[in-house]
Amino acid sequence: VKTIVVKVGSSTVADDHLHLRRRLLAGLVADIAGLVHGGRRVVLVSSGAIACGQHVLGVTERPRQVPALQAASAVGQGRLFAHYERLFGDHELTAAQVLLTSEDFNRRDSYVNARNTLRRLLTWDVVPVVNENDTTATDEIRFGDNDVLAAQVAIMLRADLLVLLTDQDGLYTSDPRTDGAAELVRKVTDPEQLAALEVGEASRRGAGGMRGKTAAAVMAAAADVRTVIANGSRPGVLSAIVTGEDVGTHILARATSASAFKLWLRYAKPVRGTLEVDAGAARALAQGGSSLLPVGVTAVHGTFAAGDAVAVVAPGGEEIARGLTTMSARDLRRVRGLHSEELRALSPHLDDEVVHRDRLVLVGEEAG
């Protein structure tokens, strides 16, 4: 294990009274420092800025309106990072604040720049402390308490391990807070099994809960990143995981040969619309090597521009691919169902292909 992404949630960073868990965070940073000094590269994805801001402002209940959440985050983010900076400094390590939004994943150039920046920081033995830029985010501020962000960062860096730290010992067969018979799940070999688990809701401090963690684990597993969900309050939890101790829930990864571009397209680029295709087009795409042509498109859903990502669904409604469209939703509605020669006669300025095969990834291909 060389590169590790560690995500710590709001319920681990702060208690129910909005105080930072200073002793716990000091232990976590010491654990990370030991890994870095041992030659490993660690990225810390940390929630808690909103809770930290609430404490400073004297706001006891987590705000529900986005402007209030953003204001609390603006107050808390700097203070939270300053605390991490002091803790890492105690171990002669430098921390770097990295704030990301979905737009950084949406645009390929921004995505590559973010990846290159993180890689350079890691080569310098700097610990990137990543959080969503809640002050400018909109829908992103409810993005699963950073779980999916952590998975996307792990995929971006092709990390060896994603660790999601929470206030429970891992995933259970049911919610242990309400069911005394709930059993800890030690290993998940098929990530699709996670959907069957009855996981609990988010804590008072956080936004995601275990459901966000299972979604992140499924995403990471498909991109060949192993995930461990464990209790962040356990001393030395990261070192224990890295050395192979039986700690938390381990979700195994699937080997993949997908390119960095296809992983970005599948997991980072937001989908702006959906294209329904006929059976012939679905079959041609599934066999690989084919582009999506207008003649195979039966319905267009959503509002999108050329260059946006769209989901492609078969007649039964199953998503079979994602790709970057060459035309807007408005143009595609005009030309769907047309053969190439008809398209050229009606709209000669449009491409013959709706999605070129080089800009398309089959669902499941990333696990191949």
Name each model feature, range by range.
Residues 1-94, 98-368:
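C-terminal catalytic "cap/lid" subdomain
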